[in-house]
Amino acid sequence: MNKLLPALAAGLVLASCKPAVSPGVAIFESFRYEGRDAVYEAHPLPTKDVVYNPILPGWYSDPSFCSNGEGDYFLVTSTFSYFPGVPLFHSRDLVNWKQVGHVLDRPSQLTGLGRQHTSGGIYAPDIKYNPKNRTYYMITTNVGTGNFLVKTQDPFGAWSEPILLPQVQGIDPSLFFDDDGTAYIVNNDDAPGGKPEYDGHRTIRIVEYDVENDCTIGERKIIVNKGVDPSAKPIWIEGPHLYKIDGKYFLMCAEGGTSDQHSEVVFRADSPMGEYKPWHRNPILTQRHLAADRPVPVTCTGHADIVKTPDGAWWGVFLGCRPTEKGFENLGRETFLLPVRWSEDGFPYFLGGEETVPVLVRVPGTRVEGTPTFGNFVVEDSFDGDKLDMAWMTLRGPADGLYALKGGALELTCSPMRATRFETPALLLRRLQHHAFSASTRMRFAPEGSEAAGLLLYKDERHQYFLKVCLVDGAPAIALERSGETLSSQALPKSFNTVDLCIASDDGLTFRFGYAVDGKEMRTLLASVDASYLSTAVAGGFTGTTVGPYAVK
């Protein structure tokens, strides 16, 4: 059934003023994304103070958030080799989130990104607020250049140029500002002496940070070696965050690797430098022990961060995945929200025993308003502004000169830069956020030679589907390409004005690719196309799938 292949004449927005089609240029008059996951239809929000998990669906991994103590919360996630880097979300209540920009929005902040693979680049950003100097800090890893931080006193405005931290080796740095003004950086690094006893043997290290001079002080110290139970040879202790709560220092870390064995664990000490002792009931969050066939499973949970609200409650965000009934997913690691509980012996935790990550979460005293970031929704972009919507991303750089907003449309210039290479192609991508979805566009394009334009489903350089208008044997055609291999093609009329393109899925298991010429009935080019090809289970990597316009020659 073609439940999500609509007649696009009704669903797509037509530009009132249509610019002429220039040679080598594809004109996209509109783009429409619709999510229809059955889980949301089966679980309607019962009251206005209830939200859906995930609060940020789609590939929003490694979340970190902070509070300024005045009712503002800011949240960031990883972007790897996408540009701009590190989306910045703002909320006043932990429920209504709005993207207000990107922390890394110019090439000078993202040096070394140009030749990295899709899952390289920016790892695990951490955002903190320092009340002593009323400054926000974002610290992160650029796989190409090392660890760095940027800062600002106005998070809605521009952030500083990178401050490099060459003494902080490893990944996943996080800042902590103590009550007395002292600051520290904790992060994941190699085994002691660079000599791991087994694969996945890592450490958490700490170093003091000079806030006035923006540099580290003294030697780094190992505060966790291997993990909670060294005798069990735990792997990938990482993603650390340090907090001071009621006079004690709590170190929260991810452990187990970021796949289905992922977890969150906690340690406690009397001093920032340790000795850190693990809670005897660790992990404080995991789903790895639960039955795979449980209803509405969430897997891979971990990499958490917590904040305190003005009323004294604690809340946390963490990443997780929502697999399909066959166990794979294309959405990537998403951002979830849960209240933090406290044990009788004074440790924070999220879930215990057989508890599962809930679909619905009540946040007392709040009210869902406007257009939420979660649940089922429709996004339409008619490209009639002077700036791109913040959801759009390019790869490795700003793609200057390859796209333009003109006459109420998006123009992409066909480029020899290809999405199958470590380059910056002529494309704009947004996150896939639902298993059941449709992504569609209305395009005007007259291909010449090897030119092609259309919609790209992108996981990485080696895993992608391209629904394109091109020439086949010198005549216009619609074709579906899988990472350079043509799967299907059909002839188009010799003369046409617009082509509507649609990629859809009912359940995240397979894709359907369709098209319509000059607003006529939608036709299916190819259905039942394997969706697992783009999944992390097949392709690997740390990102989810993205979709959007693409032009190449």
What are these language model-derived features?
Residues 15-16:
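C-terminal motif of bacterial Sec signal peptides marking the signal peptidase cleavage site
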Residues 2-7:
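Sec-dependent signal peptide recognition
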Residues 19-553:
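Carbohydrate-active catalytic/glycan-binding domains of CAZyme proteins
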